[in-house]
Amino acid sequence: KNIKNNNLRNNDILLISDVNCWDLILDKLNYPIEKGVITLIKFTIRFAIQNRLKIKIAARSQKNHFYNENIFYKKNLTNEEYRFLLKNIFFRSKNYKTYEIMQKSKITIGTMSTMLRENLYMEGKTLACNFTKTNIFDFPIKGICSLNDNDFDKFEKRAKKIISISKNHYMNLINKKPAYLVFRHQYKNTIDLVKMKLSYHLGLQEND
């Protein structure tokens, strides 16, 4: 099945890396959190390569603090996966770079980042994958936007469908309105999100 193009979103996949962003106390409870996070990275890289999709990978760290994160990738990825990741990774910055890439991506994938929720609020399509075997990181909205079964074929089928369908169709396949996420969690940057959303749509109008 061919994946439809979206001219306004010129990047296919944004993968948000959640490396080392969980509380270390969870490691003492023997949850396979690290394994779940790396499984998603591997699945997403494989999906992008096999389907020849354009991908951006958001590092957890800023460039000058990348050492430990880089070691994590080297330890857990194959040489091919590691080279692919480094070729497509970008580093966190103090500006809105990650949000800008997110707005230009057809699907945003991750496990626990708040950006998965913010992307939904900004009318983007999210796939939140919790392969950690603990419901602590379950996405608060159910439906096409969340997946807990760490089977590659199911992941690929779900991601392909999300990319292919329209935004309105996607929104009809989730069980709560995206605004639920923002107001429920009361992010400090909600005002910034609204400003970004308005600026983004104004920019699109100017380009029409």
Give residue ranges: language-model regions:
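Catalytic binding pocket for nucleotide-activated donors in carbohydrate/polymer assembly enzymes
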Residues: N79, T114-H185
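Residues at the C-termini of beta-strands that transition into short coil/loop
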Residues: K1, S17, A59, S93, ...
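Charge-rich, solvent-exposed alpha-helical interaction surfaces
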Residues: F43, F47, R158-K161, L173, ...
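C-terminal alpha-helical cap of glycosyltransferases
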Residues: F183-D208
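Donor nucleotide-activated moiety binding/catalytic core segment of transferases
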Residues: Q62-M122
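Soluble or luminal CAZymes and related metallo-dependent hydrolases
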Residues: P32-L40, K154, Q186-T190
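Hydrophobic/aromatic beta-strand patches that form the interior of the parallel beta-sheet core
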Residues: L14, K56, I107-I109, L127-C129, ...
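Conserved catalytic-core segment of nucleotide-activated headgroup transferases in glycan assembly
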Residues: N2-L77
